[in-house]
Amino acid sequence: MLRRLFEKLHNFRLLPVFVIASMFIGIVIGKWYGISNFALTPPIDAIKSIFHGTYEFSIPNTLALGVVVGLFMMIYPAMANIKFEDLGKATRSPKQLFIVASFNYAVAPFFMLLLAKIFLSGEPDLYTGLVLYGLAPCIAMVIVFTYLSAGNGPLAIILVALNSIIQMILIPVYARLLLGDIRFDVWVVGESVLLYLGLPLIAGMLTRFLGVKRFGEEWFRKLKFYLDTMSIIGLLFTLVVMFALKGDLILEKPMFIVQLAIPMTLFFWIMFIVVYLTAWKSGLNYKDSVAVGFNATGRDFEIAIAIAITAFNPTV
């Protein structure tokens, strides 16, 4: 019976229904508890407080941990499906690396800045938030999207690793260039990489290596169904948490959503189509083109939130 329920989650025709339901549940939770009235705790700070023995149970802290748990549930299954030897092959992909680096650092931040100027010039907080969102390439969700789209998973991981290194150097430069004299701890980028990429990668690799070694490939093939299910549940759970964080604000100021949805939708559609076609015309196959497209399009909301909290007011 439980497996039948899980199989419904694998039906991609039903996925939009589950996504909308998760968003609705999140908004209801946010409205019920008035969560946006609380100070938002950065997920990494909540993790640190646990290790330091200073964690206090509260709605913001619990939701902060929910983001970490949800992202781990999404990324870990994708990592577990990666073979060590495939990672080695993916490192020998100079064309893919060049396309992603070019679009991520020569196009994406400035394209997002242009969209912010066009649609949000009269809303300084929303303008700043959107520009911040455009600075950092994604280091988590793109692996999940590549995985769900049957793209080249090992290549996606290598591209994410490249982005992780480059953005630690360039984000402070781009932030000052596009937003003026702002100050934040660049280590928030490194911490995000370790938490959202490093931890699931290690756990996934150990699961595959130790599981196959002890139980065999057939066991792992059976496990894959449940790993895929975990990834989808993680996606839905993360949506609930993210919409709960600002559920009451969404209902009070729905135009915020409309104002941000237009430039963000334009950004994602235009960027993905242009990058995918560039990769395709460059001779890459579907799997590589998908991995390149998502890696050059996805943005890192975790890093954007961390910078916004440390360098700007809560509205941003």
Model-derived features: where do they sit?
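Alpha-helical transmembrane segments of multi-pass small-molecule/ion transporters
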Residues: 1-316
